[in-house]
Amino acid sequence: MDLIELQDIRKTYRLGEIDVPVLRGISLKVSPGDFVALMGTSGSGKTTLMNILGCLDRPTSGHYRFDGQDVVDLTPDQRAALRNRKIGFVFQNFNLLPRMSAVENVMMPLSYAGGGVSDQNGRERAGALLTRMGLGEHLDNEPSQLSGGQQQRVAIARALINNPSLLFADEPTGNLDSATSEEVLRVFQRLNEEEGVTIILVTHDPSVAQCARRIVRIRDGVIEPESGAVGDMPQVSKAAPAQSKPVHSAMRRGDLDKFRRSLHTALSSLRRNVLRAALTTLGIIIGVAAVIAMMEIGRGSSTAIQRTIASMGAHTLALLPGTAASGGVSFGGGSVMTMTPQDSEAIVNECPAVLAAAPIVRARTQVVHGSRNWVPAGIYGTTPTFLEIREWPLAEGDVFTERDVRNASKVCVLGQRLVDELFQGENPIGLEVRIKNVAFKVIGVLSPKGANMMGMDQDDLLLAPWTAIKYRVTGSSLANVNQSAASTSSASITDQVNSLSNLYPTEKVVLYPEISTTQAFDTPLPVRFTNVDQILVGIRSTSGTRAAIRQIGEVLRERHRLRPGEPDDFSVRDMTEMTKTLASTATMMTKLLLAVALISLIVGGVGIMNIMMVSVTERTREIGLRMAVGARAKNILQQFLFEAVLLCFLGGAVGILVGRGISHLVTVLLNWPTELSLDAILAAVGVSATVGIVFGYYPAWKASRLDPIVALRYE
């Protein structure tokens, strides 16, 4: 059976509206083991015929059978597979890839073999072929380190790596001197005579054609009658014709080998223009760095806001007294004193959603120690529960107790700002401060909290038992229950303060005793007995905020004897709403910054697309060579897409490092809170890959659509 059989092959190119015939009814047969010289002048059609014979092109009409298979109607991928398994090419210009060693150039067709071989087996086969070509000492040399003859022998070894049935040599001596040309021709003769390789040598030089056993002349697209075999050629040996050997399953390479080769090819491409690659990835680096830095700064800020809110009491509600009005004029919140310590106890006992509650009495006056004085932002009379609700630990010392509250003990706990202003480095524990000339012993110092969301210094305060502040500092007393009671009372304020122990008997502690209906009726609301300025409520969870507000409202309305339809004589401030608002604002700002960063990533992606388009143009000949040795369109697409993704990954990796560095510098230099964001890093990696795929696809697709013939001729 003939290896090649052509019947009436015609090829016509259309230039505008004109049809230009190049091949005019070519019929030809080539037997296995034959050595044919296809000779003709420039423009005779010999190169077009070789391209059709080598499955690089398709005829306009006619029939072509290769090794018994009709190849005219094969798809491009099927023709590529046929070229890879059964056809080898040797070109006039060698077409070796400059950044690859001799062994790597020879191994290139193995990358596209259907079965594939491992890197180790492929290297051994390539090394053996190069040794047969007399290049055993130049395996790792790049083409620039080899002579012209040596480069052509590397090209021959590459053509033989997959044991092809047919070897095409297109003007193989065109760029060589006479001595080297004879050396290369002897290699072809030896391959044909000793190994039975079928060779078609394309040339215009009669002296080169003489090395073949058969000369086929072509003129103006028509084959001239053959003159017979070359008479002075030695007899062909009895070696069996070369057969395309299938690759055994034991030699199959895995995905890891494919990945390694693709990675090596991509890195070799990037090494050609390191500076250009670095500048190309600059947009990706800036975008990823911005994403990382903004996410970490945003997350740190969000955490800081949450901590600030927590320090103010994220799980807290503030209950304020009602509003008095006269003549249509409102006197503002707290103008009617409707809250009592008893309300605080009732809320804790009767509201399941409430964890704790603390009454608060406020005072505004100066605090004196020695010759120094300071007016703190807040002087709060409360209970020890206040610090539990606020989750506020002590830096040193102790907090006052419920016994201190019962006894109106003159003890206090200071905030850090007040300590700094009054004691200036001196340890305040055990010392005294005076509030309205009442001496209070300092028993504890609060840990610093800093400013709250409104910018107020939370450390500028003094805490003491509410009974001490109310009865010893602000001047409220039992005598002031009402004016008439005061006029008939003979006890002084001091005596009544000292009689507080009678209100809190040690046998059975009733911190806030009930008052009778008569007392409640006779006592004007603005000065109701044991009224407080505020009640701080700690709820069990933010999800139970609405339930807590509803329960508190029901309890207080019942206690204050409010009829249905009457307005509340109290108000509730919900910190969770402020928390949600601030969190929403922080999230919005983070998204805005991320949008800016994503724009930078898009700009970087456009840069990737641009550089990949340039790379496709620069490597057009390489693409044609890879297609000639068996690369399918999807192989070219995958390779260039891999390079684009690798470029983005490298830019992303550098961007992650830069972003982390920026985040660290912001923390060190500006003292802004930042927090490591693994989500941002993973997102940056994902975005980098996505940018590489999206913006690298078109250049890769364009590369895969190149015509191998046009690509090989590209200058």
From Swiss-Prot:
> Which InterPro entries is this protein grouped with?
AAA+_ATPase, ABC3_permease_C, ABC_transporter-like_ATP-bd, ABC_transporter-like_CS, MacB-like_ATP-bd, MacB_PCD, Macrolide_Exporter_MacB, P-loop_NTPase
**Chain positions recorded as ATP binding sites:** 40-47
Q: What is its EC number?
A: 7.6.2.-
The entry's cellular-component GO terms read: plasma membrane
Q: Which PROSITE patterns match?
A: ABC_TRANSPORTER_1, ABC_TRANSPORTER_2, MACB
Q: Which domain of life is it from?
A: Bacteria
Predominantly, its location class is membrane
| Listed SMART domains | AAA
ABC transporter domain residues are 4-245
* One of the GO biological process terms: response to antibiotic
**Stated role:** Non-canonical ABC transporter that contains transmembrane domains (TMD), which form a pore in the inner membrane, and an ATP-binding domain (NBD), which is responsible for energy generation. Confers resistance against macrolides.
Quaternary structure, per UniProt, is: Homodimer.
The record's comment on protein family reads: Belongs to the ABC transporter superfamily. Macrolide exporter (TC 3.A.1.122) family.
Annotated protein name in UniProt: Macrolide export ATP-binding/permease protein MacB
Organism taxonomic ancestry? Bacteria, Pseudomonadati, Thermodesulfobacteriota, Syntrophobacteria, Syntrophobacterales
